[in-house]
């Protein structure tokens, strides 16, 4: 990795650590959202650096839908045990009682009840006034216009027309009771930055990001990995072994794999250098309707 690139990554690292420390100093009850993916892994690594040799001054929160890849649950529990941080896991009890199923109820309803409502329930339950998230501006157009400190009202709603100015590295965290701030320390990172930093810092990642033969079924132009026996095969669908990996991770029935031969971090980085598509092309929830992500964020989604 050349010196200019290394300097660029260290600048991003310093900015993110500064943001994490600012939030820890400014807010009374912050939390870090942990979705188990590559961005969460980088954000956790940066947080550990920010407070080394001490422990994290805030817990991690995983909003569980019950439909994550089995490898994600294993990686989550192993990471929590290895690093010894406080891990909170919340699953929407009403959604569980209703038997919400992405195959039966669709991606929009599943996401709204199990993720958006589940997140709001957890934030209310523990009274968090700031929540870190691993979203980046290069991921999607609504995230591109969102501030690093993203103000949310007492219903956890985001208003893109009512955002606070952020001049240089000055952030406005003033809130009233019941309001909160979503904080995005990785806002200025790109997908390539993330992978190069993972390689540079030797950060442990879930193997789903690396290509290997996996059982998949083709549906609506996406390759869905068959993770367990809850798969609802449609007429004419056949499960086959394909060499695939994931660029983004979510609920397995709603997350498409990409065909790839990249089995190592250098090969992923090489693939990123020539990629012309968004990593979120594999997220079914982004296809629900035009402006889908912005609508979800207005309702309280991350």
UniProtKB/Swiss-Prot annotation:
Record EC number: 2.7.7.4
One GO MF term attached to the UniProt entry: sulfate adenylyltransferase (ATP) activity
BP-aspect Gene Ontology terms: hydrogen sulfide biosynthetic process; sulfate assimilation
Family: Belongs to the PAPS reductase family. CysD subfamily.
Gene source species: Serratia proteamaculans (strain 568)
This protein's record includes keyword ATP-binding: yes
Entries under InterPro entries matching the protein: PAPS_reduct_dom, Rossmann-like_a/b/a_fold, SO4_adenylTrfase_ssu, Sulfate_adenylyltrnsfr_sub2
Gene (UniProt): cysD
Pathway annotation: Sulfur metabolism; hydrogen sulfide biosynthesis; sulfite from sulfate: step 1/3
Organism phylogeny: Bacteria, Pseudomonadati, Pseudomonadota, Gammaproteobacteria, Enterobacterales
UniProtKB keywords: ATP-binding, Nucleotide-binding, Nucleotidyltransferase, Transferase
Job of this protein: With CysN forms the ATP sulfurylase (ATPS) that catalyzes the adenylation of sulfate producing adenosine 5'-phosphosulfate (APS) and diphosphate, the first enzymatic step in sulfur assimilation pathway. APS synthesis involves the formation of a high-energy phosphoric-sulfuric acid anhydride bond driven by GTP hydrolysis by CysN coupled to ATP hydrolysis by CysD.
Reaction(s) catalysed by this chain's protein: sulfate + ATP + H(+) = adenosine 5'-phosphosulfate + diphosphate
Name of the protein in its database record: Sulfate adenylyltransferase subunit 2
Subunit details: Heterodimer composed of CysD, the smaller subunit, and CysN.
Pfam family, one: PAPS_reduct
Family annotation (HAMAP family): Sulf_adenylyltr_sub2
